[in-house]
Amino acid sequence: LRLIEKRKSVEGVENIDTLLASERSPNIPTASVDVVLLVDAYHEFSFPRDVMTGVVKGLKSSGRVVLVEYRGEDNNVPIKRLHKMTQHQAKKEMSAVGLQWLRTDDYLPQQHVMVLSKL
């Protein structure tokens, strides 16, 4: 987080906030964010439902979640299975916390970039 804050300062970026999450909460104020970007992180959460419920609570009504995960459907991606996620799995788990899948962008060679919104 310090590196991001330093780079924001150097480049004069004002529209990015960093927050230190806990194991069970993203610590996002209610209805305060436009986008939550999770890169190769979701599958590591010890309490994914708790964290994602907090993410949804923190999204503005038009907010989005961008979930980037290694393609679980692709056996050619040289990552252990526990560090991958299928689109089907992501859609199921995200819908359980109040998110709906909008699209998947596949411009990265080994990862899905899944875009979701509040239901």
Indicate where each model-derived feature is located:
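A short acidic, Gly/Pro-enriched loop at the edge of an enzyme's catalytic core
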Residues: 24-36
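A short His-aromatic
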Residues: 27, 41-44
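Core SAM-dependent methyltransferase catalytic element
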Residues: 97-119
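Glycine-rich phosphate-binding loops of nucleotide-dependent enzymes
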Residues: 33, 62, 89, 103
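Conserved class I S-adenosyl-L-methionine
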Residues: 1, 64-91
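A short glycine-rich, Lys/Arg-flanked "PGG" loop and its adjoining helix->strand segment in the class I
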Residues: 49-64
